[in-house]
Amino acid sequence: MDALVLFLQLLVLLLTLPLHLLALLGCWQPICKTYFPYFMAMLTARSYKKMESKKRELFSQIKDLKGTSGNVALLELGCGTGANFQFYPQGCKVTCVDPNPNFEKFLTKSMAENRHLQYERFIVAYGENMKQLADSSMDVVVCTLVLCSVQSPRKVLQEVQRVLRPGGLLFFWEHVAEPQGSRAFLWQRVLEPTWKHIGDGCHLTRETWKDIERAQFSEVQLEWQPPPFRWLPVGPHIMGKAVK
């Protein structure tokens, strides 16, 4: 099976050789950083229609929280275009973190469309190192379709726990690997080396639920969801919350 995967990976590499050459020369990353926000804006507009009811169900739990300073202090990690803003309850104080500064103009548009929120700031940073944020400064951290593309999910979750107050909540929604041994998992393995370039570091075969369960949260609630688009190689999704 491994030999078949390697053969098919090489075949895909040959078919996408210009992309891999650009990546090897260091030219692809700036291109991807510039145009990936437009791709995400288009994709989230379509996928959120399919996931809207579940998203509302997940984030409706935020309104039951009481922030340490009144309104709920919410950090969105890997905020992207701000597509989640519509689901947050009135008065949330939202801080946004994303390593790609090109998302900021999309965030500005989302902020204008969601006046029910208080916007604190946009921080350009990686989730593995959010030194700009103080310990125990957040009531809620939201992480959707982010842990697939970070360098180290373990370090990101450590940072999440650092910035969350005791009893604070992590809300997550992530795509994960298909069941090992399945045909879908085989194709994820085949496509992953190329997909990482297309998806700005996105990994198709991560078992992110294991990272969350190992992260020493006091409680984890997790639910599986089918992928919104069968024509994409992303696998099933997990949604839920974890308590510090």
UniProtKB/Swiss-Prot annotation:
It catalyses: a thiol + S-adenosyl-L-methionine = a methyl thioether + S-adenosyl-L-homocysteine + H(+). CDD domains: AdoMet_MTases (cd02440). GO terms for cellular component: cytosol; endoplasmic reticulum membrane; lipid droplet. It is found in: Endoplasmic reticulum membrane; Lipid droplet; Microsome; Cytoplasm, Cytosol. Its EC number is 2.1.1.9. The keyword Cytoplasm applies. It is a peripheral membrane protein. Keywords: Cytoplasm, Endoplasmic reticulum, Lipid droplet, Membrane, Methyltransferase, Microsome, Signal, Transferase. Pfam families: Methyltransf_11. GO terms for molecular function: S-adenosylmethionine-dependent methyltransferase activity; thiol S-methyltransferase activity. Residues 1-23 form the signal peptide. InterPro entries: Methyltransf_11 (IPR013216), SAM-dependent_MTases_sf (IPR029063), Thiol_S-MT (IPR052356). It is an enzyme of class 2 (transferase). Its main location: endoplasmic reticulum. This is Thiol S-methyltransferase TMT1B. It comes from Mus musculus (Mouse). The lineage of its organism: Eukaryota, Metazoa, Chordata, Craniata, Vertebrata. The gene is Tmt1b.
